[in-house]
Amino acid sequence: MKTIIAEKPSVAREIARIVGATKREEGYFEGGGYAVTWAFGHLVQLAMPDGYGIRGFVRDNLPVIPETFTLIPRQEKTEKGYKPDSGVVSQIKIIARLFKESEQIIVATDAGREGELIFRYLYHYIGCTTPFVRLWISSLTDKAIREGLRNLEAGDKYDNLYLAAKARSESDWLVGINGTQALSIAAGHGTYSVGRVQTPTLAMVCERYWENRRFTSEAFWQLHIATDGCDGEVVKFSSSEKWKEKEPAMELYNKVKAAGCATVTKAERKEKTEETPLLYDLTTLQKEANAKHGFTAEQTLEIAQKLYEKKLITYPRTGSRYIPEDVFAEIPKLLAFIGTQPEWKDKVRAKAAPTRRSVDDGKVTDHHALLVTGEKPLFLSKEDNTIYQMIAGRMVEAFSEKCVKDVTTVTAECAGVEFTVKGSVVKQTGWRAVYGEEKEEITIPGWQEGDTLTPKGSSITEGKTKPKPLHTEATLLSAMETAGKEIEDDALRQAMKDCGIGTPATRASIIETLFKRGYMERCKKSLVPTEKGLALNSVVKTMRIADVAMTGEWEKELARIERGELSDDTFRKEIEAYTREITSELISCDKLFGSRDSGCACPKCGTGRMRFYGKVVRCDNTECGLPVFRLKAGRTLSDDEIKDLLTEGHTKLLKGFKSKQGKSFDAVVAFDGEYNTTFVFPEAKKDKKFSGRKK
C-alpha cells in the first residue's frame, strides 16, 4: 500500500477520487492500493519554553536557545493554559499507522516552503523511516494531478526547501520568544510581543505615521496661460516654476496677463512605448486588490487559496511574475478560454504569437505566476469572482500588444516666464484597451520652435504641498517586498524579491498579527499605529530588532539555503548570535520603562496603584493591569493631566490634539464604561457639568 498525504481534507478528497480510493475511513480514504490522508495545516509545532523546563518570564533564563528543538502536537489554549489539541493528536495517530503500514509515502502537501515543513515536521515527530516521494504540481485540476502522479519526484530533491523552512521556523521562535520575554521583563508590566518580521513591519508603519503627522504644509503659487489648440480645443500651459511667496508670483502674473504673445522655445516629439504589465504574483495581486477593491491582504490570500482548491487558478503563494516556456505553450488555449467568458469576449484578440515579456525560465523557481486553469468559474461569490477576474484580466493584459504613444512636450516663454505643456496621441492602444482605463490626453498642435502663440487667458492658482500618505495595505506590502526601498519598476521589484521582509505566503499573516496584537488599526484604507504600537516602536526603533534592512538580509539568507548556497548550520549560528544581541539590547530597556508611583489608586480595580512607565501608566495589580497610554492623537498627556483622568474620570478641556486628517482639535479625555479612554468634545458637556465616568 502507498499512502498519499495532502495538506487539507478537500485536496485529499480530489486526489482520492483520481486514484480510486473511494472507501471513507476515519481520517483517510482507501482503495486502489492507496490510502489518502490529510493534515489540517501544521499538526506539529516547536515546543514552547516550558517544554525545555523553563517557566515564566525570568531574566536569568534568557536567552532561551535550545540545543535541539523539540516537536510537539499542535496546542490549543484553555482556561488552564495550553494543551495538545485532541483532534490533532487523533489524526497524528492515524497518519503514523498508515505511514508504518506503507511501502511508500507520496507527499502531496502544498508545493512550497510551508507545505514541505508541514510534512517534514510530522514525519520527524512520528519517527518514520518509510521512503517518500514528492507530488509537485502548480494546480489541482485532474490533468495536473494525473501528470504529477505519473512524474513523482525524489523526496530528497526538496531537502533544501525543508531546511530553509525549518531555519525560518526556528529563527522566528528564537527571536520572538526571547525578544518578547526580554522586553516584557524590562517593562515590568504587561506583555510586549516582538518578532523577527512583525517588529520591522511595525517600524515602517510608525515611521510613515510620524512623517505624515509632522509634515508642515506650505503654500505655493503657479501661473497658467491658455491658447487655441486643434479642433477648437484649449491648450493650457503651466509655469515650470512654483513660487513660495504670493507677492512675486502676482507680480509676474500681472506681466503675463498684460503680454500679448508667447514664443515657443522648444518642441519635442518622441514615441513612447508602455510595456505590458507582468503577470500577478501573490503580493502584486494583494496590492492591487487592496488599492482597487479594498480587500485586505489576508482576504485576498484566502480567496486565492479557495479558487486554487476549486481548480480555477494555479498555486497562489507564488513569488514569481513569470512563466516558463512549457507553460507559455498553453497560453493561446487559455486566452481562448478566457475569451469565451462574457466579461472578456470582446477583449481577447486572437494572436499567433502572444507577447513574451512574462516568459523567462530563469525567473521561475518553485512556482510560476498566477494563471487561470481553464476550468469554468461557476457559482462564485462576488468577492471570489472579483479576484478570479483580476487574474484573468491580467493574463489578457500581459499577452496583449504594447501600448505605443506619440508624446509631445512644448515649452513657451511669456513675459520672461517659462511655461510647459505635455500631450500625447495613442498610436496603438495595446494592453491599455483591456480595461479601457487610458485617459484621453489633449492633442498638441504641430508647433515649432520660434512660433508665436496668442494667449486666450491667464490665471494664477494656489496649491499646498502634501505629505506622504499613511500606509495602506497595498503600500505596506510594497515596502515589505523591497525592505522599505521605494521602487516603482516592476522588473526591479521582482529582482529584489529575495531581499524583502517576509514572503508572499507570510506577509498577510504578519500584517494581521499587528492588528491582533493591538499595534495598529485600520482607518478606512489607511493603517494607523495605535498608542500601544507607537509606544513599543519608540522604545525599539533604534535597535536591531526593528532594522528593516537586516530583516531583508535574513530573508536573503533563507533563499540561499533554499538554493543550496548556504548551510542551515551557518544560518543557525548567525541567528543565535543575533538573538543574544537583541535579547541583551531589549532587556537593558528597563531604564526606558523605569516606573514611579502616580499617587493614584487604580480607578478600575480600586486595589492596585497606578504607576508611571514613560509612555504608559499602568495598574500594578497583575490581575487588573489597566493601561493608560500618554500619547493621544499626537499629543502627550502630562502627569497632572493623567492624575485628573485617574481621580476625576476625565481631564480638563485640552488643546493641541491632531485628527487622522491632520486637523487640530480640542477635547476632554475621559474613561468610558469599560475604562477605555475616549474623547469628549466641548459641545457634549451640559450645564457646565461633566457627564463622564468619575470614580
Regions found by a protein language model. Give the residues of each.
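Intrinsically disordered, low-complexity regulatory segments
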Residues: M1-S169, W173, G179, P467
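Basic, low-complexity terminal or inter-domain segments flanking catalytic cores
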Residues: K2, G81, Y125, T180, ...
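Amphipathic alpha-helical transducer elements in NTP-driven molecular machines
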Residues: P9-A16, G33-V36, F40, R59-L62, ...
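Short strand-coil-strand connectors
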Residues: E30-G32, A226-C230, E413-V417, Q661
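C-terminal or mid-to-C-terminal helical accessory/interaction module adjacent to the motor/catalytic core
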Residues: G87, D142-T227, R269-K270
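Metal- or metallocofactor-binding catalytic centers and their adjacent structured scaffolds
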Residues: K244-Y280, Q286
